[in-house]
Amino acid sequence: MTEKIGLFTGTFDPLTNGHLDVIKRASQHFDQLYVGIFKNDQKNPLFPTDKRVEMLEEALTSLSVTHKVKVIKHERDLTVNIAKKLGVTALVRSLRNSQDLEYEKNMFYFNMEMTGIETIFFLAKPELEPLNSTRMRELHAFGQDVSAWVPENVSRELRKLDEKK
């Protein structure tokens, strides 16, 4: 039987409880789930890539899925190219709302055309729908406490950033 290998990518800057929920749920459907922290040249990161990897790996220890989940990072390549190199059988994406659906439908088309790799979509739980990294960065920049929406270790790192100001 073919091993089921998934790939869930993002910038995770910062990691949210919504991201963790998708990772936990997706890991139940794969023998191996890669979580790729990728650089996005169109975003100005709050945390360097290595720090985001460290925070994600620490947050994953609370989920009891570390035996199935491997965090990887990549600076410059298409997700589908990385997926082919890793032998991925399906890409994992999360949908929070209709805007996500429209964006992901377009990506699905090109990913399928270029590689034939399927995409599996996970709907965000209703209580996690509003969460996204951009909103967390914005709220944090204006001095708001985001600890209810991010893992504890991420909240701690955000407080450290505040102390450096």
Swiss-Prot record:
Catalytic activity: (R)-4'-phosphopantetheine + ATP + H(+) = 3'-dephospho-CoA + diphosphate
Broad enzyme group: transferase
Compartment list: Cytoplasm
Gene Ontology molecular function: any one: pantetheine-phosphate adenylyltransferase activity
Chief location of this protein within or outside the cell: cytoplasm
Keywords: ATP-binding, Coenzyme A biosynthesis, Cytoplasm, Magnesium, Nucleotide-binding, Nucleotidyltransferase, Transferase
GO biological process: coenzyme A biosynthetic process
Sites marked Transition state stabilizer: 19
Name by which UniProt lists this protein: Phosphopantetheine adenylyltransferase
CDD domains the record matches: PPAT
Subunit structure: Homohexamer.
A GO CC term assigned to this protein in UniProt: cytoplasm
Pathway(s) annotated for this protein in UniProt: Cofactor biosynthesis; coenzyme A biosynthesis; CoA from (R)-pantothenate: step 4/5
Signal sequence coordinates: none
